[in-house]
Amino acid sequence: MMKIIIFLIVSSLVLIGVKTDNGYLLDKYTGCKVWCVINNESCNSECKIRRGNYGYCYFWKLACYCEGAPKSELWHYETNKCNGRM
């Protein structure tokens, strides 16, 4: 019985790890990255609202970077629909 419980815990942790990722937050309205200048608090709040662990403003890219968020909440180069809009 104890082995089954341990197996279930480990399996659930693996599944949680597979469904989350790190990356730039996606503005679903524009298809662009969520932009910022130096406001880590804003990015962290937005990241947590989207079920991420921690977010910050990546200064060189002027975009909010989020760790541990679901992949559906993140911007991906392959599916970029921004076309230079803000």
UniProtKB/Swiss-Prot annotation:
Among InterPro entries, the record links this protein to: LCN-type_CS_alpha_beta_dom, Scorpion_toxin-like, Scorpion_toxin-like_sf, Scorpion_toxinL, Scorpion_toxinL/defensin
Report the leader peptide range: 1-20
The record's account of tissue expression is:
Expressed by the venom gland.
Cellular location of this protein? Secreted
Q: What is a single cellular component term in the Gene Ontology annotation? A: extracellular region
Instruction: Give the domain of life.
Output: Eukaryota
Q: Which UniProt keywords apply?
A: Antibiotic, Antimicrobial, Calcium-activated potassium channel impairing toxin, Disulfide bond, Ion channel impairing toxin, Neurotoxin, Potassium channel impairing toxin, Secreted, Signal, Toxin, Voltage-gated sodium channel impairing toxin
Located on the interface between the toxin and the human BK channel, annotated site positions? 48, 50-51
Q: Name one GO molecular function term.
A: potassium channel regulator activity
Limits of the LCN-type CS-alpha/beta domain: 21-83
Tell me the domain comment.
Has the structural arrangement of an alpha-helix connected to antiparallel beta-sheets by disulfide bonds (CS-alpha/beta).
Q: Write out the similarity annotation.
A: Belongs to the long (4 C-C) scorpion toxin superfamily. Sodium channel inhibitor family.
| Protein role | Inhibits sodium channels (Nav). Also moderately inhibits human calcium-activated potassium channel KCa1.1/KCNMA1/BK (41.9% decrease at 2 uM toxin concentration). Shows moderate antimicrobial activity against both Gram-positive and -negative bacteria.
What is the recorded name of this protein? MeuNaTxbeta-1
Source organism per UniProt: Mesobuthus eupeus
